[in-house]
Amino acid sequence: MANPIEEILGTAAAIAKGMGITFKEMMGPTVTDDYPDAPPKFEERFRGVHVLQRDVNGMEKCVACFLCAAACPSNCIYIEAAENTDKIRMSGGERYAKVYNIDYNRCIFCGYCVEACPTDAITHGHGFEAASYNTSTLVKRKEDMLVPVPPGAKPPSMADEVPAGAH
């Protein structure tokens, strides 16, 4: 049987050693970020919410080829294509995405859509605050994801489009 005084001294030494480590860590620099007071720093390869890109002329890069939707393993991308006309050109191709939705209830941020896009129209941005109490707000529309028109570029306007049946 061990000496009770040795046991008490051993326990006190272990507690003192643990408290020393604790106080040393308390006085050192913090490892965690001060979010939301300070913006987080992301690596270049961070996969945040999706962004639909425009070219230098302000036209949408998406040509509605559906390759991103086909590559998506969770089927969270929905696209409706429309033809570009002489009066209105929304993209550089024959078609443009009239409707482009991503359902973040299903998206797993795998990046397959970004890899599949031949025109680099869809990319991962650095946005990460997508949490919501309402799941219907997690379906992002094209208008929510498009980058602003570059300065000096004239954006295409849907107001010039001929109404259906008026041909």
Curated annotation (Swiss-Prot):
Pfam families xref list: Fer4_7
- Which GO terms of the cellular component aspect does the record hold? plasma membrane
**Amino acids binding [4Fe-4S] cluster 2:** C72, C107, C110, C113
Top-level EC class, please?
translocase
Q: How are cofactors bound according to the entry's free-text note?
A: Binds 2 [4Fe-4S] clusters per subunit.
| InterPro entries on file | 4Fe4S_Fe-S-bd, 4Fe4S_Fe_S_CS, NADH_quinone_OxRdtase_chainI
Return the EC number.
Answer: 7.1.1.-
Chief subcellular location equals membrane
Source species, domain of life: Bacteria
Every 4Fe-4S ferredoxin-type domain range: 52-82, 98-127
> Which Gene3D superfamilies does its entry note?
3.30.70.3270
Task: Note the PROSITE patterns from the entry.
Answer: 4FE4S_FER_1, 4FE4S_FER_2
Q: How does it sit in the membrane?
A: Peripheral membrane protein
Positions of [4Fe-4S] cluster 1 binding: C62, C65, C68, C117
| Residue span of region Disordered | 148-167
For this protein, what is any one GO molecular function term? Answer: iron ion binding
Question: Which key words tag this protein in UniProt?
Answer: 4Fe-4S, Cell inner membrane, Cell membrane, Iron, Iron-sulfur, Membrane, Metal-binding, NAD, Quinone, Repeat, Translocase, Ubiquinone
> Biological process GO annotation list?
aerobic respiration
- Protein localization: Cell inner membrane
Cofactors, names only: [4Fe-4S] cluster
Q: Which HAMAP family match?
A: NDH1_NuoI
Please report which protein family the annotation says this sequence is part of.
Belongs to the complex I 23 kDa subunit family.
Q: What does this protein do?
A: NDH-1 shuttles electrons from NADH, via FMN and iron-sulfur (Fe-S) centers, to quinones in the respiratory chain. The immediate electron acceptor for the enzyme in this species is believed to be ubiquinone. Couples the redox reaction to proton translocation (for every two electrons transferred, four hydrogen ions are translocated across the cytoplasmic membrane), and thus conserves the redox energy in a proton gradient.
Q: Which NCBIfam families match?
A: NuoI, PRK05888.1-3
Whom does it interact with, and what assembly results?
NDH-1 is composed of 14 different subunits. Subunits NuoA, H, J, K, L, M, N constitute the membrane sector of the complex.
The protein's name = NADH-quinone oxidoreductase subunit I 1
Protein encoded by which gene: nuoI1
